[in-house]
Amino acid sequence: MFYAGNRLPYMMQLGSGTFDALPGITFVTQHENLTYSAQVQGIIRLNSTTIGYQLGDEINATTWLGYTWWKGFGSSLRLEGNWLETLRGNDPSMYSYNEIATNPQNYGGIRLQGLAGLSYQFEEGFIANHRIALEYGIPLYQKANGIQNKLNQTWMASWSYSF
């Protein structure tokens, strides 16, 4: 149980408490109506917190294939993988093993997700260059460290503007 003055569990805190390197690389190519992209990004924790723990490093990779069918209407298939290391150390002010959320062994894991999407790019009028998109995903593989909720499905809706 949490009371006033207690620190929140690790993932509910507003930051990592460390300096982090954020490397990444993106590749995009287009041939007529077909677009292919791949991206890898990471979070590398460069130090520990003054409290005595360090969030795990992260690697996120995604690749997708998109096709524009006609006049701005397109669809896409995407594969996304996430790897998150477990926490190193612990915060001694938390009762680490009494609560699932404060146990440092219950963080991190591997997830692979498959996603499919639809989009429409407006080409004329006052909403030209606006894009709406909807994407649905399901987990293909999940291996969580410790006790964690698993992902069942994801939905993403967006509205963006290009200039």
Language-model segments: residues:
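Outer membrane beta-barrel transmembrane domains
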Residues: L55-F163
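Outer-membrane pore/translocation modules
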Residues: M1-S48, N106-Y107
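Outer-membrane beta-barrel proteins
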Residues: T49-L55
